[in-house]
Each structure stands twice: as structure tokens, then as C-alpha cells.
């Protein structure tokens, strides 16, 4: 989630037939949501959300490991296996309820002794890290699958105080030298 900037529903709605580990691409076109008490796989938020997403090696390796884990779960579950075709499932192959994922995420954070944050904060963190790495805003917009650049820059990006300090220092130096 953090590396790809996925929304919780996009992660939980990702199916194996939308992941190409050989070419290293995931096609994010669906999301899993609870609607009127029922889990439903629905199209993503916007057309720009459906863009193919290149998978960094760390993600491809994690997904390959997930396939192995799923195969073990399928064997252990036996006839109780309810294969949904989704990448992330319960030990019986059923979709993971978004609320349960939130609880699991928070429990893992607490166990790792890191600050417990909302799942969606990983998406904002992804955007902020892309900014800190000087990734062009249009590239960040594509990674986060936003339809408007303003959403990427205004809502998700947080400029660090160190970045602000450095920018003002550079500006001050330029003005002090009479360059501008």
C-alpha cells in the first residue's frame, strides 16, 4: 500500500488475473467495499484509477510470496477453501472485510512498536515521499491515480519543515548574491 499508494479497497479488490508478475505490472481496476452489509467488488473511483501500475521489485517479490502463502492456505483449508481469485484473502480464500483489514493493520503497527495510523495515511505518506524524492508531480499523480494534479499536491503532499527551510535558504542566497 505504502509503495504503490493504493487505497484500501483497491488493495483488497486486487485479483490475481490483474497482476502480471512476469512483466511486473498490476492493473488496478476494482475495489472491495462493504455496501449495505455486503462485500462487493466494484469499479475503481475514477477512470484514472484504472491505469496499469508498474510493480517495483519489492512488490513483485512480496506478491510472489503471497502466492506461496495462498497455496499453503488452500491446502490447509481443504474443502473449506472458497477461492475468490483475490490476492489478499482470509485463510479460507474469502475476501477480507475492509474493517477487519483496518484492525489487522493497527494490530501489526502496535506489535511492531510503530505509531498506529489510519490505513489511508499510507497513501498520503506515499505522496509525501514522492515529493521528498523530487518525483515530478505528474508522475506522482499517475502513481496515485488521481484525475487532477491539484488533488495530489493539495491534499496528499506535505512539505516538510526541512524542505521549507532549505528552499528559503536557497532563495535567500540567490537574492543575497543579486542573481535574481
Language-model features, listed with the residues they occupy:
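Short, charged phosphate-coordinating catalytic segments
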Residues: 1-32, 138
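Short, basic (Lys/Arg/His-rich) helix/loop patches that form interaction surfaces
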Residues: 4, 53, 69-79, 83-142, ...
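A short, basic/aromatic helix-end/turn motif that makes direct DNA contacts
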Residues: 13-19, 141-147, 155-158
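ATP/adenylate-binding site constellation spanning eukaryotic-like Ser/Thr protein kinases
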Residues: 16, 60, 124, 146, ...
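C-terminal secondary-structure termini that scaffold catalytic or DNA-interacting sites
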Residues: 23, 31-59, 64-65, 69-74, ...
